[in-house]
């Protein structure tokens, strides 16, 4: 269960870092750069924690797929970016792929907890 929480935090952190990257305007705006660093550092830290209990293939596919979809939604909602019908279809395929990948996995044995948890 902790693995899923860490994975969710990794996704949120990655989307935050990507949003700050957009706001940095190619690293020409100083204040968002701290958000970029904090967001991506947190994302990889939480992703590494999630890998203690979640298979790499599932965790990484979920992190990148859901992160991609949420980043596109943030771009649409906050920055007025457009998403074409083909784009919506593509994002739907990404999410469907993540779901199918995760559903096709055999139930994993619970991995031993470590001191860090």
Swiss-Prot record:
Molecular function terms from GO: transmembrane transporter activity
UniProt keyword annotations, A-Z: Cell membrane, Membrane, Transmembrane, Transmembrane helix, Transport
Chain ranges passing through the membrane: 3-23, 31-51, 59-79, 81-101
The keyword Transcription belongs to this UniProt entry's keyword annotation: no
Protein topology in the membrane: Multi-pass membrane protein
One Pfam family matching this protein: Multi_Drug_Res
Matching SUPFAM superfamilies: Multidrug resistance efflux transporter EmrE (SSF103481)
Subcellular location: Cell membrane
Assigned GO CC terms: plasma membrane
Entry-linked InterPro entries: Small_drug/metabolite_transptr, Small_multidrug_res
Keyword Repressor: no
Signal peptide: none
Subunit description: The efflux pump is composed of EbrA and EbrB.
Role according to the record: Part of a multidrug efflux pump. Confers resistance to cationic lipophilic dyes such as ethidium bromide, acriflavine, pyronine Y and safranin O. The efflux is probably coupled to an influx of protons.
Protein family: Belongs to the drug/metabolite transporter (DMT) superfamily. Small multidrug resistance (SMR) (TC 2.A.7.1) family. EbrA/EbrB subfamily.
Name of this chain's protein: Multidrug resistance protein EbrB
Name of the gene encoding the protein in the UniProt record: ebrB
